């Protein structure tokens, strides 16, 4: 007996975004399978999606097991354990596709992120404000820190090796601010004026990743490390410069994307 499937997607927002093309492929190739997606992280990047919005459930959704799961085949795709991934032949989206669809390595569409009008307007206001305050006509989103970054007694560290060094961040902001209005993407804010940066840097706080997606969608360029921002830029077709540290560019980024410049350190 063939059962409908429930795909459990875990991890951070980058993994959620990268799962989208594989789930779209599954729907295309299995039209009779009324599958659902159980989000062990967050549903935010499935929201508004023409297909996945109605299929996405939080793990704590009321009566999820009784109403759905007990009659379904439960699947927990893990892209990091896909052979093509850990041998640098597949990126994260392709690894999800192999784990979910088992069709081997193939080209996929970019993830679809659907933004609301409200999100777009909020992002436009952020971009317009920083351009007005700096007098610059071009904007750049800069995400220098990955998920493993932390601050202790005024020192910023990331033992995973994915983040920029703080001194490098300051020097890049000094250089970029000559040409761009900078929007700093990060939970740890730096007071750049104390480090000799004369131009104003926008440091939005307390906004969710969907608003960040909308902001990135309206900027001229993205600069960042191996973190969620580059996946958003790729999905939204924004040119990017990505600096890779302890991870492999073939896995975590898009070296074949013409609009991406990847610096493998």
Q: Which role fits each region the language model picked out?
A:
Residues 4-6, 139, 181, 221:
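Structural motif
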Residues 41, 143-146, 185-188:
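Short, well-ordered beta-to-alpha junction loops that form the rim of enzyme active sites
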């Amino acid at each position: 007996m063939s059962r409908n499937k429930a795909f459990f997607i875990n991890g951070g927002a980058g993994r959620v975004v990268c799962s989208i093309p594989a789930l779209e492929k599954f729907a295309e190739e299995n039209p009779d399978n009324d599958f659902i997606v159980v989000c062990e992280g967050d549903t935010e990047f499935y929201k508004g999606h023409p297909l996945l919005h109605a299929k996405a459930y939080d793990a704590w959704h009321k009566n999820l097991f009784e109403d759905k799961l007990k009659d379904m085949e439960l699947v927990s795709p893990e892209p990091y354990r896909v052979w093509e991934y850990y041998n640098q032949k597949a990126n994260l989206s392709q690894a999800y596709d192999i784990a979910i669809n088992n069709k081997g390595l193939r080209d996929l569409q970019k993830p679809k992120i659907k933004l609301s009008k409200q999100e777009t307007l909020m992002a436009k206001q952020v971009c317009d404000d920083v351009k007005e305050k700096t007098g610059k006509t071009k904007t750049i989103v800069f995400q220098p820190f990955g998920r493993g970054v932390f601050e202790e007694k005024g020192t910023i560290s990331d033992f995973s090796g994915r983040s920029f060094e703080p001194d490098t961040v300051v020097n890049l902001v000094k250089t970029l601010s000559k040409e761009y209005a900078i929007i700093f993407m990060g939970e740890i804010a730096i007071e750049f004026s104390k480090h000799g940066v004369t131009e104003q840097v926008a440091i939005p706080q307390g906004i969710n990743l969907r608003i960040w997606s909308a902001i990135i969608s309206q900027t001229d360029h993205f600069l960042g490390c191996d973190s969620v921002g580059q996946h958003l830029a790729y999905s939204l077709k924004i040119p990017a410069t990505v600096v890779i540290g302890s991870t492999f560019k073939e896995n975590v980024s898009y070296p074949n994307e013409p609009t991406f410049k990847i610096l493998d350190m």
